[in-house]
C-alpha cells in the first residue's frame, strides 16, 4: 500500500476523482467546439451547376399556372402546349375525349396559345429555358401533325367552299393588278340577275383571242357604244368591256350573250352595271377611251360625258326654270299633275332643266304650279277659238281615217230624218238661242251613250254628273268646255234643270259659282243630254219644250253574230263625218278667219326666239 495514501478517507477519494473527470471533459469540449468553428467558412472553389435550367423550369411552371388560371376565368378550352416540362406542369387529371367536338370560332383560342408556345428551333427560348424547349421539340411536332390531320378531316367541306369562292377573289385581284383600281370602285352591285340595265361592265377571263376580236363586230348589232381593252394574265386572255345596249338587258341575258360569243363559263365572267354617278369611275373610263390599245365603237356614253365634259357640267349647274317646264307641258297637252311629274322626271337624262327639277326639294309645288299654268293657257286658247277652229284643231289630232256613213246609217236605223238631225246639229254647234240643247231619248240599249260619248271624245268635251248636284260647283266644268254631255238624266235631273237652268238652256249668260273664286258670267256651251224620260211629251216640263231639240232612239243597237257592234261609232267616224259635211254644217275654214298673218306657235317660256328660215 502506498504510504502517500495513508490517512485518505473514502469520501475524500471520491471527491478527488470527480473533479478530475470534470476537468478532462471541459477540455475535450473546447477542442471539439474549436474544430467546428474552423469549418464554418469554406474557402474552396465552387462549381456553377444547373441553376439556369432550374430557374427556367420554375418560370415556365409559373407561367403555365398563370395561363391555366386565365383560361379558367375566360372559359376557354384547355390546350397545354408544354406537356412534359416537369411532372408538376400537368397536375390536372386527364379528361375523356368528348364524343362530338364543337368547332372553334375563328381561331380565337389558337391565337393566344400560339403566342405562348412559339419556340425558336435553332437557338432555343431564353424565357422558358433552352434545355426544356429542346427536349419537347419532338413531342410538340408529333402532336402538331396529329392536330393538322384531324383538322383536315373535320373542315374538308369548308376548304372546298373557300376554294370555290376564292376564284372570284383571284379574278378581282388580277383586275386590280392590271388596272390599278378595284372593280368594285367602278361598278354597283345588282343582287337580282333579272334586274335590267342599259349599261354593263363585263370582265371575261380565259377567252380565246380570236373570239375577243370577233366580239367587236358581233356586239355592234345590239349596242350603241362599245369599249374593249384586252390584257394577258395568268388565267389567259382578259377582256374588259363597257357596253351600252340599245335596249335594257338583265345579267342573265348578257351572260348568255357572252357564252355564245366567247365560249366561256359562268365563273369566268364578272358582270355588273357601272356607277353612272361616280366621277372617279367616269374619269377612269374616259382615260381608258383615249388609250391606243382600246377598241371603240359609237359615241361616248352620256353618263360619262355628263361628268367629264365642261359643257355638261355647266348645264348641270343651271337652276330650275319653271317656264321651260310649263312650255313642255303645254306642247305635250299635259294638264294632269301626275302625268306632268312622271313624264318630266323621265326626261332627266335628256333635259338639263328636268334634271334640275329632280334636284329641287319642292317638286310638288312646281308640279302644281305647272299644271295650273298649263290649264290657264289651254283654257284661254280654247276661248279664243271659234267652234270651227276648235273642231279643226281636234280633228287634226286624230290620226287615221274612218267611215262617215256609219253615223248616217245609225241615224237612219233609228228612223230619224237625217236632214232634220243635220239642221238641229248645225244650230247646236253655233249655239243658236233656244236651240242650244240636244236631247236623245229612248229605252235602254239603243246606243244613246255610245253615240254622244264618241262625239264628246272627238271634240274634247266635258261630262256632267248629277250625282254631284249637292255641290254648288258641279257645273264648274262648263267654264272650260266647247261642248258638254249629261248622260242618263232622270226625273230629278229634269226637275233641277226646270227649276234652275232654264236660262242656261237658252244660251244666254248666267252666273256660275266657281270654287275659291267669285261667280263668273258665262254662256253655257252646246249641251247634249241622254235620258229615258220623254220630256217632250211630259206636261210637267212644259217650259222646257221650247228650249230642247229632242230625237228618239227607239231601236236596240244592232249587233253581229259575235255580239260585237255592227256599226262602228268612234272618233274616226266623227272625223270623217265632219270633213264630209263641213260645208253643210256652216263651218268656216280657219284660213278664212285669219287676217292674213301667218300663225305663230304659242311661247310661254323665256327661251331664245327661233330664227326665220
UniProtKB/Swiss-Prot annotation:
- Ranges for domain SF3 helicase: 413-566
| Residues the entry annotates as binding ATP | 442-449
Q: Give the EC class as a word.
A: isomerase
Q: Where in the cell is it found?
A: Host nucleus
Q: List the disulfide bonds.
A: none
* Residues covered by region (Disordered): 1-31, 128-152, 588-613
Q: What superkingdom does the record give?
A: Viruses
Say yes or no: keyword ATP-binding present. yes
Tell me, in a sentence or two, what this protein's role is.
ATP-dependent DNA 3'-5' helicase required for initiation of viral DNA replication. It forms a complex with the viral E2 protein. The E1-E2 complex binds to the replication origin which contains binding sites for both proteins. During the initial step, a dimer of E1 interacts with a dimer of protein E2 leading to a complex that binds the viral origin of replication with high specificity. Then, a second dimer of E1 displaces the E2 dimer in an ATP-dependent manner to form the E1 tetramer.
Instruction: Describe the subunit structure.
Output: Can form hexamers. Interacts with E2 protein; this interaction increases E1 DNA binding specificity. Interacts with host DNA polymerase subunit POLA2. Interacts with host single stranded DNA-binding protein RPA1. Interacts with host TOP1; this interaction stimulates the enzymatic activity of TOP1.
Q: What is this protein called?
A: Replication protein E1
Amino acid at each position: 500500500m502506498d504510504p502517500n495514501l495513508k490517512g485518505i478517507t473514502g469520501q475524500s477519494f471520491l471527491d478527488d476523482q470527480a473533479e478530475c473527470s470534470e476537468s478532462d471533459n471541459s477540455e475535450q469540449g473546447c477542442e471539439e467546439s474549436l474544430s467546428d468553428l474552423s469549418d464554418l467558412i469554406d474557402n474552396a472553389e465552387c462549381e456553377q451547376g444547373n441553376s439556369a435550367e432550374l430557374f427556367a423550369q420554375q418560370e415556365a411552371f409559373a407561367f403555365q399556372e398563370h395561363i391555366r388560371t386565365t383560361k379558367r376565368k375566360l372559359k376557354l378550352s384547355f390546350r397545354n402546349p408544354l406537356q412534359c416540362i416537369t411532372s408538376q406542369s400537368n397536375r390536372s387529371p386527364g379528361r375523356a375525349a368528348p364524343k362530338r367536338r364543337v368547332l372553334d370560332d375563328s381561331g380565337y383560342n389558337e391565337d393566344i396559345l400560339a403566342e405562348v408556345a412559339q419556340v425558336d428551333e435553332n437557338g432555343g427560348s431564353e424565357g422558358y429555358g433552352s434545355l426544356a424547349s429542346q427536349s419537347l421539340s419532338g413531342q410538340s411536332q408529333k402532336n402538331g401533325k396529329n392536330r393538322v390531320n384531324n383538322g383536315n378531316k373535320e373542315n374538308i367541306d369548308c376548304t372546298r367552299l373557300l376554294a370555290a369562292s376564292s376564284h372570284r377573289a383571284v379574278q378581282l385581284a388580277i383586275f386590280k393588278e392590271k388596272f390599278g383600281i378595284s372593280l368594285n370602285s367602278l361598278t354597283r352591285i345588282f343582287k337580282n340577275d333579272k334586274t335590267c340595265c342599259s349599261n354593263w361592265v363585263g370582265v371575261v377571263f380565259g377567252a380565246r383571242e380570236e373570239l375577243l376580236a370577233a366580239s367587236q363586230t358581233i356586239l355592234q348589232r345590239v349596242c350603241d357604244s362599245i369599249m374593249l381593252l384586252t390584257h394577258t394574265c395568268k388565267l389567259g386572255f382578259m377582256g374588259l368591256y363597257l357596253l351600252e345596249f340599245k335596249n335594257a338587258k338583265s345579267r342573265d341575258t348578257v351572260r348568255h350573250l357572252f357564252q355564245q360569243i366567247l365560249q366561256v363559263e359562268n365563273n369566268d365572267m364578272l358582270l355588273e352595271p357601272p356607277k353612272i354617278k361616280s366621277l372617279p369611275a367616269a374619269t377612269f373610263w374616259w382615260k381608258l377611251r383615249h388609250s391606243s390599245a382600246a377598241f371603240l365603237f359609237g359615241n361616248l356614253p352620256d353618263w360619262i360625258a355628263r361628268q367629264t365634259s365642261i359643257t355638261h357640267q355647266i348645264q348641270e349647274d343651271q337652276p330650275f326654270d319653271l317656264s321651260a317646264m310649263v312650255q313642255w307641258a303645254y306642247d305635250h297637252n299635259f294638264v294632269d299633275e301626275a302625268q306632268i311629274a312622271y313624264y318630266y322626271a323621265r326626261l332627266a337624262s335628256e333635259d338639263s332643266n328636268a334634271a334640275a327639277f329632280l334636284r329641287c326639294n319642292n317638286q310638288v309645288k312646281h308640279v302644281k304650279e305647272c299644271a295650273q299654268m298649263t290649264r290657264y293657257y289651254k283654257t284661254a286658247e280654247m276661248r279664243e277659238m271659234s267652234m270651227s277652229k276648235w273642231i279643226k284643231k281636234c280633228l287634226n289630232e286624230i290620226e287615221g281615217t274612218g267611215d262617215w256613213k256609219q253615223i248616217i246609217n245609225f241615224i237612219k236605223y233609228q228612223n230619224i230624218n237625217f236632214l232634220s238631225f243635220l239642221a238641229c246639229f248645225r244650230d247646236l254647234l253655233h249655239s243658236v238661242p233656244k236651240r242650244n240643247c240636244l236631247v236623245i231619248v229612248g229605252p235602254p240599249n239603243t246606243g244613246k251613250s255610245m253615240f254622244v260619248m264618241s262625239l264628246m271624245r272627238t271634240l274634247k268635251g266635258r261630262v256632267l254628273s248629277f250625282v254631284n248636284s249637292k255641290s254648288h260647283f258641279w257645273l264648274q266644268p262648263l267654264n272650260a268646255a266647247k261642248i258638254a254631255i249629261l248622260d242618263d238624266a232622270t226625273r230629278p235631273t229634269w226637275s233641277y234643270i226646270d227649276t234652275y237652268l232654264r236660262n242656261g238652256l237658252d244660251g244666254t249668260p248666267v252666273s256660275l259659282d266657281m270654287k275659291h273664286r267669285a261667280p263668273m258670267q258665262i254662256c253655257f256651251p252646246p249641251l247634249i243630254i241622254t235620258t229615258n224620260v220623254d220630256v217632250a211629251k211630259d206636261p210637267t216640263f212644259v217650259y222646257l219644250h221650247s228650249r230642247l231639240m229632242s230625237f228618239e232612239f227607239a231601236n236596240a243597237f244592232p249587233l253581229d253574230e259575235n255580239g260585237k257592234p255592227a256599226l262602228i261609232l268612234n272618233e274616226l267616224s266623227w272625223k270623217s263625218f265632219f270633213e264630209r259635211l263641213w260645208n253643210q254644217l256652216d263651218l268656216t275654214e280657219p284660213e278664212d278667219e285669219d287676217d292674213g298673218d301667218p300663225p305663230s306657235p304659242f311661247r310661254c317660256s323665256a327661251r331664245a326666239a327661233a330664227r326665220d328660215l
